[in-house]
Structure formats: structure tokens, C-alpha cells
A protein has these predicted regions:
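Recurring C-terminal helix/loop segment of individual leucine-rich repeat
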Residues: 14-18, 37-41
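Conserved hydrophobic site in ankyrin repeats
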Residues: 189-190, 216
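Repeat-mediated protein-protein interaction surfaces in helical alpha-solenoids
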Residues: 148-163
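Eukaryotic acidic, Ser/Thr-rich intrinsically disordered low-complexity regions
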Residues: 209-232
Length: 232
């Protein structure tokens, strides 16, 4: 069960995808508004929610995200957002028999970045990146930055600069993420940032992605054709 697409669905009942261990992608229309519990229990390969809705449209995405604490990518028409994993803990204060609820991971805060009407609050989402840099891995931060830069709906100049600065400081992780995802748009974006491509080209060849290697080799050939009068 690689992909499920239900355009007319309004309600997802409890345990709708229970034990769908091969489920990787769920595609829904804009009208989903009711969600039961335990929707994706044991769906350990789930990677993507695709909502066929405008990037600024009110949707049920916030509730849908609440059903998944693992890493998840969201695709809207014109936007792509990556939400990192978060964990919840109940710690018992033994003498008082009180349980303290704690949450670990910036992914929880990012899942709260919505307007009162139910649309994604892109400014709030982008503002969470600085805190995410404290605790998230290079790979996850590169996924987040690449998604926002490749489809920059609602992306402000300051946030764009922050994402580009992070990718520039972590070229190896950025290229590896783009290559592992076979994401040619992300690869071209990184090339456009003038990042060194030699190691990325070697990795492309190693994993057998010829289209990506062509993008990187094209950059290298163009670079060799440039010169100034000092070369004469």
C-alpha cells in the first residue's frame, strides 16, 4: 500500500490505517475536517502527506499532523514543509505521585504553526528554524531548508537568508539529502548557491543517479569556461 488518495473524504475514522506497514504516502483533498484516534498506528514507513489544496488555504492539516509524531513531509500546492520527529514523556514524581508531561523535539512546536483559521502560518514556521538548529540533526535541518527554498511560498527575505546560510555551512549534508531523494530541483538550488560540487558528483556516481551527475557535471563545465584577462 504505497499511496492512498481519497479526494472526497471528509472524515478519517479511528484506526483508519492501522497496521498498514507499507503505507508511504497519503493524498487527500482539501475538505478533510474530522479525524479519529490512532490513525497511523504501526505505519512505520509513512513519509508524506499530500494535500491537494492551495498553500494558503485552511485545511485539516494541523489535526492530521497531530496523529504523527515521527518525521513527516507535507506537500501542498506550491509549498513543501518538513516536520521533524518529536517525543512525549510522562515522568513520575514518586513522592507526590504526580506525572510531569514533557515534550522533546522542535517538531512539536512546528506542528502548532497555524493561523486561527487553519492555514499554515509560514512566518511562525520559519521562525522556529533557529531553535531547531539547537537540537535537530544536519540531515533534518537540510530537509527543512531545502523544502522551503525549492518551493518558497510565504518565505520572507530574512528566513531565506537563514536557510541559505545553513545550507552553505553544511554542503555535504545538503547535497547528500538532495541526492538521496533524487530531487533535481534541490540539487539545482544547491548548485545555484555556488557550493563545491566535486564530492557531490562522486556520491552521485556511487549511488547511480545519472541525472543528478549531469547537473553537477554541467556546473563544473560552465565553471571551467570562465576566465578573466589575468589568464591571458
Amino acid at each position: 500500500l504505497g499511496d492512498v488518495y481519497k479526494r472526497q473524504v471528509r472524515v478519517l475514522d479511528s484506526a483508519a490505517f492501522y497496521n498498514c506497514r507499507r503505507l508511504r504516502r497519503v493524498t487527500l483533498g482539501p475538505g478533510v475536517e474530522g479525524f479519529g484516534s490512532d490513525l497511523f498506528t504501526n505505519c512505520r514507513q509513512l513519509q508524506t502527506f499530500r494535500l491537494r489544496a492551495a498553500a494558503d488555504a485552511p485545511t485539516g492539516l494541523k489535526k492530521l499532523l497531530g496523529a504523527v509524531s515521527a518525521d513527516i513531509t507535507v506537500e501542498l500546492d506550491g509549498a513543501q514543509l518538513f516536520y521533524p520527529e518529536y517525543s512525549e514523556f510522562l515522568d513520575e514524581n514518586t513522592p507526590a505521585h504526580i506525572f510531569n508531561h514533557s515534550i522533546e523535539g522542535e517538531g512539536y512546536r512546528m506542528r502548532q504553526c497555524f493561523t486561527p483559521g487553519g492555514a499554515v502560518d509560514y512566518a511562525a514556521f520559519d521562525a522556529s528554524f533557529a531553535q531547531a538548529c539547537v537540537g535537530e540533526s544536519e540531515d533534518k535541518l537540510c530537509r527543512l531548508a531545502l523544502g522551503r527554498l525549492v518551493q518558497p511560498f510565504g518565505l520572507g527575505d530574512d528566513a531565506r537568508a537563514d536557510y541559505e546560510l545553513y545550507l552553505t555551512a553544511h554542503p555535504k549534508a545538503a547535497f547528500r539529502r538532495a541526492i538521496d531523494d533524487r530531487d533535481e530541483a534541490a540539487l539545482r538550488l544547491l548548485v545555484g548557491l555556488s557550493l563545491p560540487t566535486a564530492d557531490a558528483a562522486v556520491y552521485c556516481a556511487r549511488v547511480g543517479w545519472s541525472a543528478g551527475a549531469a547537473v553537477l557535471l554541467g556546473r563544473a563545465k560552465r565553471a571551467k569556461k570562465t576566465y578573466d584577462f589575468d589568464d591571458l
